[in-house]
Amino acid sequence: MNMLMALMVNITLSILLITVAFWLPQLNMYTEKANPYECGFDPMSSARLPFSMKFFLVAITFLLYDLEIALLLPLPWAIQMYNTNTMMLTAFILVSVLALGLAYEWTQKGLEWTE
């Protein structure tokens, strides 16, 4: 019962904070708020330049493999647990899914800079 009550309070508080965070900035909208910030000076050129998709894909790939390392770091401590089969299966599935993603990106030439 206490767990259910704590869960309901957390969900209610989260929904309330998300609602306030989306609703509050729209009350006082003016042009300076919508402009990009450039060190306190007026922008020298348009700040809405197109962004290269290659850089975006490399950044997303880096984040995915950074997350993989973060998820695999507790592996040595998890080996000391009683049920190592489940832990090893989970780690194998994680590495397999990420390897398949890398292979797919490689075959789709997402890592090629010359094109």
From Swiss-Prot:
Its main location: mitochondrion. It catalyses: a ubiquinone + NADH + 5 H(+)(in) = a ubiquinol + NAD(+) + 4 H(+)(out). It is found in: Mitochondrion inner membrane. Coiled coil: none annotated. The chain crosses the membrane at residues 4-24, 55-75, 86-106. GO terms for biological process: mitochondrial electron transport, NADH to ubiquinone. Keywords: Electron transport, Membrane, Mitochondrion, Mitochondrion inner membrane, NAD, Respiratory chain, Translocase, Transmembrane, Transmembrane helix, Transport, Ubiquinone. GO terms for molecular function: NADH dehydrogenase (ubiquinone) activity. GO terms for cellular component: mitochondrial inner membrane; NADH dehydrogenase complex. Its EC number is 7.1.1.2. It is an enzyme of class 7 (translocase). It is a multi-pass membrane protein. Gene3D superfamilies: NADH:ubiquinone/plastoquinone oxidoreductase, chain 3. The keyword Disulfide bond does not apply. Disulfide bonds: none annotated. Core subunit of respiratory chain NADH dehydrogenase (Complex I) which is composed of 45 different subunits. Interacts with TMEM186. Interacts with TMEM242. Core subunit of the mitochondrial membrane respiratory chain NADH dehydrogenase (Complex I) which catalyzes electron transfer from NADH through the respiratory chain, using ubiquinone as an electron acceptor. Essential for the catalytic activity of complex I. Belongs to the complex I subunit 3 family. This is NADH-ubiquinone oxidoreductase chain 3. It comes from Peromyscus gossypinus (Cotton deermouse).
